[in-house]
UniProtKB/Swiss-Prot annotation:
Homodimer, and homooligomer. Heterodimer with SNX18. Interacts with ITCH. Interacts (via SH3 domain) with TNK2, WASL and ACTR3. Identified in a complex with TNK2 and clathrin heavy chains. Identified in a complex with the AP-2 complex, clathrin and DNM2. Interacts (via SH3 domain) with DNM1 and DNM2. Identified in an oligomeric complex containing DNM1 and SNX9. Interacts with FCHSD1. Interacts with ADAM9 and ADAM15 cytoplasmic tails. The modification Phosphotyrosine is found at residue 239. Residues 129-144 have a biased composition (Polar residues). Residues 201-213 are annotated as: Critical for tubulation activity. It is a peripheral membrane protein. GO terms for biological process: cleavage furrow formation; endocytosis; endosomal transport; intracellular protein transport; lipid tube assembly; mitotic cytokinesis; plasma membrane tubulation; positive regulation of actin filament polymerization. Residues 159-169 have a biased composition (Acidic residues). Keywords: Acetylation, Cell cycle, Cell division, Cell membrane, Cell projection, Cytoplasm, Cytoplasmic vesicle, Endocytosis, Golgi apparatus, Lipid-binding, Membrane, Mitosis, Phosphoprotein, Protein transport, SH3 domain, Transport, Ubl conjugation. This is Sorting nexin-9. Residues 89-100 have a biased composition (Low complexity). It holds the Pfam family BAR_3_WASP_bdg. It comes from the Eukaryota.
Length: 595
């Protein structure tokens, strides 16, 4: 009997790597468990076959029964959902396919507001998992750019702070294409890591103190909110509420990946040089430092601002140098996105990450950030909209409009990712082979003609041979073209898929707050709160609404710029591609005289 395995986490195949896209909960047939390098070969129920990471599946008993099918399956599934890894790789799901990326753990399936009636529990406000997978391509030129800044601080010492010595940061792709002789950078895909901050995991918001401790009621019903030192202003601009943008903007160049080691060379890691353009002073960070930053930003701003996950630590199916470049490219895109946000980029924790001067300053800032109390829904207490109060009906309408748009865009992005993946496969697989076949057939025909012994056909035979070689050249062009145009379009869509995956939780919190206000009439009737308390609740939910509208205006502004740029680039490269092919065909044609 064939061995069966249950998929524990969503996994998305990289184009051209002979991998198989699988969805959490899916049962696959193991066709070759001994591939090696942390991989096995499996086949899904559609007959599609490919490589799957061994850490992503659980081998089922010989009777084929799923050990998770008994007991409280709903509760089991809910628990697993809270730990499910969200992918950030090149092929994603369409809205209609559960076998593509995201199909088995769609954050939109449970974004509706929690049911009213339980004022004693704040679990409903923090139980949803955050959206993940933010990857967007930045300029490929950054791959090879080095900045020789001798003053670059090398990051916190790994031997002085135990919490920075955890093994989960030592990177190495578990791809079977890695050489066995490579020095040990801890292998294996880390989806099962228990650390809540691991970037490849979907993080339950109630695991963070900011989402569990300061509940929504604390924000809505507090008699008087403490006056925070930090203020986040919201103004009304030409397109509605908006964040206040800083007078000068900056980016951060991620470059110069270098291998470091610890424990006398027994463990190795990659660290990257970060150079903010506004200071031009470099600092070095390892991946787990980025992971720490992501966790702190999620804890602090995740109720109001979508904070997409870091690119996956593992980029599968790649040799080490290419893997490092790909991860650096995606870290660059993530940092650029954070630098472009007027609230995140100006936050103390983000500035600390980029501008610390020595190890002492780093550790002081790190611990201060971890003790920050203005996290979770309490971030709204720092916001001051310079706008009139909103009534509850308008607040609800604005929330519904955001939910409707982001859900529709999520579906559209997934569809484009699916189509793009299929096109990539055609361009790197069957299509070049067809051109190669035409080329070889033409050259074979020329060889046959040459064997005739007839003296007057040399020019024709040479022309046919060159035409055949032209088609072989076209085959190579077709196979390489996706890297020049489709790659950038796919990366942009992956980044937005990550952003859109964050909105169900944000919208869920807003809808829940609206429900709390609706329930407040009962509390007023029973004298548990005063009418003035209810008005305070409406005002504070209005502040949340202004924050949501400001964030959406920022989102739309970036969306218009990004998609205009990336689709323009795609079309420019396509035009150049077809013009190159046309020129080669013209040259081949010129060898055939008109008779």
């Amino acid at each position: 009997m064939a061995t069966k395995a249950r998929v524990m986490y969503d996994f998305a195949a990289e184009p051209g790597n002979n991998e198989l896209t699988v969805t959490e909960g899916e049962i696959i047939t193991v066709t070759n468990p001994n591939v090696g390098g942390g991989w096995l070969e499996g086949k899904n129920n559609k007959g599609e076959q490919g490589l799957v990471p061994t850490d992503y599946v659980e081998i089922l008993p010989n009777d084929g029964k799923d050990p998770f099918s008994c007991g409280n399956s709903v509760a089991d599934q809910a628990f697993l959902d809270s730990l499910t890894a969200s992918t950030a790789q090149t092929n994603s799901s369409s809205a209609n396919s559960n076998n593509q990326v995201g199909g088995g753990n769609d954050p939109w399936t449970a974004w509706n507001a929690p049911k009213p009636g339980n004022w004693d529990s704040s679990d409903a406000w923090g139980s949803r998992t955050d959206g993940t997978s933010a990857q967007r391509n930045s300029s490929a030129n950054n791959w090879d750019t080095g900045f020789g800044h001798p003053q670059a601080y090398q990051g916190p010492a790994t031997g002085d702070d135990d919490e920075w010595d955890e093994d989960w940061d030592d990177p190495k792709s578990s791809s079977p294409y890695f050489k066995d002789s490579e020095p040990a950078e801890a292998g294996g895909i880390q989806r099962g890591n228990s650390r809540a901050g691991a970037s490849s995991m979907k993080l339950p918001l109630n695991k963070f103190p900011g989402f569990a401790k300061p509940g929504m009621e604390q924000y809505l019903l507090a008699k008087q909110l403490a006056k925070p030192k930090e203020k986040i202003a919201i103004i009304v601009g030409d397109y509605g509420p908006m964040w206040v943008y800083p007078t000068s903007t900056f980016d951060c160049v991620v470059a110069d990946p270098r291998k470091g080691s610890k424990m006398y060379g027994l463990k190795s890691y990659i660290e990257y040089q970060l150079t903010p353009t506004n200071t031009n002073r470099s600092v070095n960070h390892r991946y787990k430092h980025f992971d720490w930053l992501y966790e702190r930003l999620l804890v602090k701003f995740g109720s109001a601002i979508p904070i997409p996950s870091l690119p996956d630590k593992q980029v599968t199916g790649r040799f080490e140098e290419e893997f490092i470049k790909m991860r650096m490219e995606r870290l660059q895109a993530w940092m650029t996105r954070m630098c472009r946000h007027p609230v995140v980029s100006e936050s103390e924790v983000f500035q600390q990450f980029l501008n610390f001067r020595d190890e002492k300053e780093w550790k002081t800032g790190k611990r201060k950030a971890e003790k920050d109390e203005l996290v979770g829904v309490m971030i709204f207490s720092t916001m001051e909209p310079e706008a009139p109060d909103l009534d509850l009906i308008e607040i609800e309408q604005k929330c519904d409009a955001v939910g409707k748009f982001t859900k529709a865009m999520d579906d559209g992005v997934k569809e484009l990712l699916t189509v793009g993946q299929e096109h990539w496969k055609r361009c790197t697989g069957p299509l070049p082979k067809e051109y190669q076949k035409i080329g070889k057939a033409l050259q074979s025909l020329a060889a046959v003609f040459s064997s005739s012994g007839y003296q007057g056909e040399t020019d024709l035979n040479d022309a046919i041979t060159e035409a055949g070689k032209t088609y072989e050249e076209i085959a190579s062009l077709v196979a390489e073209q996706p890297k020049k145009d489709l790659h950038f379009l796919m990366e942009c869509n992956h980044e937005y898929k990550g952003f859109l995956g964050c909105f169900p939780d944000i919208i869920g919190a807003h809808k829940g707050a609206i429900e709390k206000v609706k329930e407040s009439d009962k509390l007023v009737a029973t004298s548990k709160i005063t009418p003035q308390d209810k008005q305070t609740m409406v005002k504070r939910v209005g502040t949340m609404s202004y924050a949501l509208q400001a964030e959406m205006n920022h989102f739309h502004s970036n969306r218009i710029y990004d998609y205009n740029s990336v689709i323009r680039l795609y079309l420019e490269q396509q035009v150049q591609f077809y013009e190159t092919i046309a020129e080669k065909l013209r040259q081949a044609l010129s060898r055939f005289p008109v008779m």
